[in-house]
Amino acid sequence: SYKREYEWQQPKNNKIFEQLTADSLKTEGTFAMTLIQDGNQIESKMVQPGILKTYIPKEWAEANGTTPDAYKGFLPLQTLNKVFMYNSTGSAEYKNCWDFVAEGVHPLYMDIDSEIVGKNFLYMLTEDKYAGWLKDAYDALDDTKKAYFKPVIDEMATDAEDLGLGENGAYALAWIKLWVENYNEQTDDGPICNTLVTDSATDQAGLLVYSKLRSVEESAGVSLNNIKVAAYQDGYKGIGGYG
């Protein structure tokens, strides 16, 4: 068995890369290990410059027919889920993934140019299976909401054909277009969570890492009771998030 005493910290607003880069320039660094969830930025900002090295346990390598020195890449430790959430202190209801791109709705979201996994999510929606889910969710809307989205879907039909997408590709492109044009750009999921759990964030919504809820501390004006996960609500239709 192993026992270790250690100190840890959690940089905010995506500053972890700057902090580790500065630490690597010291004669004797402060940090011995890091856990980062963004594989794209790990590769571009940490691996290519030679700041981080992978740790491969000897026993794991031997069990998989290799050695620590020969293994390339990093071992994934966890899978995180980003889900649609909304502040429930008001009257707004988000029962369909199209509600998050409806008129006047501006969900809080980490900018897709800051976190590439968010951009990958949007690309993913054009795959036939997920585009079909968006079509089914659209079909479940009432006539008023359908009428609002229909012109955008029709507008995207030519692009969907030019891109070689499947029969429901226009629905995916329409949802993506509306999302990108209307989301409220944020620097990190932490501040998004901190906003949504307040009494004052009435009817606001966001797409963020589910685990951020664990760091919420109950206080006057701040509570987990102020936030709901959309996909957990009865009758929810469509995409609930991504992992």
Tell me what each language-model feature is.
Residues 61-66, 78-81, 222-243:
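Periplasmic-binding protein-like
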Residues 18-25, 29-34, 53-85, 97-98, ...:
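A structural signal for short loop-to-beta-strand junctions that line the ligand-binding cleft
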Residues 23-34, 51, 104-107, 197-208:
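Alpha-to-beta junction loops
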Residues 38-50, 68-95, 113-130, 238-243:
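Periplasmic solute-binding protein
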Residues 25-29, 46, 75-79, 100-103, ...:
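Extracellular/periplasmic catalytic domains that process cell-envelope and extracellular macromolecules
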Residues 130-228:
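Ligand-binding pocket segment of bilobal, Venus flytrap-like solute-binding proteins
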Residues 91-108:
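Hinge/capping helix and adjacent helix->loop/strand transition within the periplasmic-binding protein
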